Amino acid sequence: MFTQPELAPIARLLAESGVSDLVFNGYSYAAVLRHNRWSAVASGFESEEQFAQAVKLLVSIGGRQIDLAHPFASANLEKVRVHAMLASAVNRQTHLSIRVHASRDLALSQWLGVNQITQAQTQLLRQVLDSRESFLISGSAGAGKTTLLRALLSENSSERIITIEDTVELQLLSKDCVSLVAREANSEGRGEITLNQLLIESLRMRPDRIVIGEVRSLELVTLLQASSSGHCAGATIHAASIEQVSARIESIATASLFEPQQIARLAKSSIAWLIHVSIQGSRRCLEIRRNV
């Protein structure tokens, strides 16, 4: 994945089979996530200085800058998403978190084949797509929201789908899929392009379906307004259960300076389906219901 000698320890760990996440807490501790289980591994770094230099190089490959004046950085590379935090006044060690992007599209039939979903759920999910009604996929971090969203969107290659993400994860293979990616401000505080800005632009791009990788802020309200005006929309949202989706929507509305009950009513009228994904042991569990 990386050919630079400074990044060899990271490349070695990422090359291991089944690794979906890799984290470092300082130079001496590393852990990998395989099949939803964490295990400690040898880091391969010999000093904090060596590790910090590797982190700076990795972030720079992603077109970002990290230093003591700006000790935090996120970067999106071809196959991984990186978040780094240099040792500074707020933390004693340099930290690195790497999420590996899925290397292939997972079809709903594959989820069914490995007993992740039932035949009835597969049929209902296809009904959600065929209805061209808007939906939200909820779940906690690492539950598989993006994986399920990718599987859903891959079911219909004839749609013109516009995806909007802060880091590229969906990576749909359809030729008529447009991928828009938000951009953080540079070290001078300039050049930021938000999810909400991209969403507004996407409304003018003749989409059959608009999808936001994850809604966290103002883009949720804009997406609900677009859906209520007839656009077919989809997104993921962090929530611990399907019952907590409404509270999460109200929380985002409040943080975005909107009246929460008003936005909750808008969500009720514009989002037709709620899909919740969770992990129980080694299996994913789905709950699909009408938003009534």
Residue ranges and their predicted role:
Residues 137-139:
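Hydrophobic anchor at the beta1->P-loop junction of P-loop NTPases
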Residues 38-131:
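P-loop NTP-binding catalytic core
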Residues 135, 151-269, 276-279:
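Switch/coupling sub-region of P-loop NTPases
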Residues 145:
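Conserved lysine of the Walker
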Residues 142:
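Walker A (P-loop) phosphate-binding loop of P-loop NTPases
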Residues 268-292:
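Conserved P-loop NTPase
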